[in-house]
Amino acid sequence: MSICLIAEEGADSGALSSLAARWGLVSDPDAVMALVLTAERLELRKQDEPKLGAIFVDFVAGTMAHRRRFGGGRGEAVAKAVGIKKDYLPDVVDATAGLGRDAFVLAALGCRVRMVERNPVVAALLDDGLQRGYRDAEIGPWLQARLTLLHASSMTALRDITPPPDVVYLDPMFPHKQKSALVKKEMRVFQSLVGADDDADALLEPARALAKKRVVVKRPDYAPPLAGVPAQSMLETKSHRFDFYLPA
């Protein structure tokens, strides 16, 4: 995959070369999308829209740390959706990991979560965030035990991953109507990078074949059910819903 690769002052240019080789990235100085290694972290930037800022994964500080400390805990919708109960912490495969937010919330609550991400740039961002998280004194020990990344297509992972999880979680990209700054920024950058999840409908059947307990599909409230298959039950929030499917 071609993308502009930049090592900022203070960053390790050798590390950037190793990263490119690991994820199969080819540097294109003229590319609109840039993967930038700073002294602190790996960032994704849209060079023709610098006001959008940088996208990066940070499990230690910022929004994710705040959500871990002050969020709804087991009362969070995603926790309810995967079926977390007092003595039940499901093993989860998040087959459309993105920036890993929901996966991190579940891991912070005690679930083992295997994230799957097929796009090499997004996988590189996720891995960078994970490695920094693993090194953190506070969250590192449990993060290493509970949250891992597999760089593969969702279809391949759903067919081959072992052992099978209790829950398969799907959150395929869907055009957002909301105009919040965060959604706007991330969706614009992500859709420039990866496009729409045109093959998302094909994930439902293998997900149901893999999951031991349930498949959870996160959808905007206005989106049709995945693959046109009506959910067997659902959990609705203010702007989203979680569609539930039994194994098949």
UniProtKB/Swiss-Prot annotation:
The keyword rRNA processing applies. GO terms for cellular component: cytoplasm. It is found in: Cytoplasm. It catalyses: guanosine(1516) in 16S rRNA + S-adenosyl-L-methionine = N(2)-methylguanosine(1516) in 16S rRNA + S-adenosyl-L-homocysteine + H(+). It comes from the Bacteria. Its EC number is 2.1.1.242. One of its GO terms (molecular function) is rRNA (guanine-N2-)-methyltransferase activity. CDD domains: AdoMet_MTases. Keywords: Cytoplasm, Methyltransferase, rRNA processing, S-adenosyl-L-methionine, Transferase. Its main location: cytoplasm. S-adenosyl-L-methionine binds at R101, D102, E117, R118, S153, S154, D171. Pfam families: SAM_MT (PF04445). Belongs to the methyltransferase superfamily. RsmJ family. Specifically methylates the guanosine in position 1516 of 16S rRNA. This is Ribosomal RNA small subunit methyltransferase J. The gene is rsmJ.
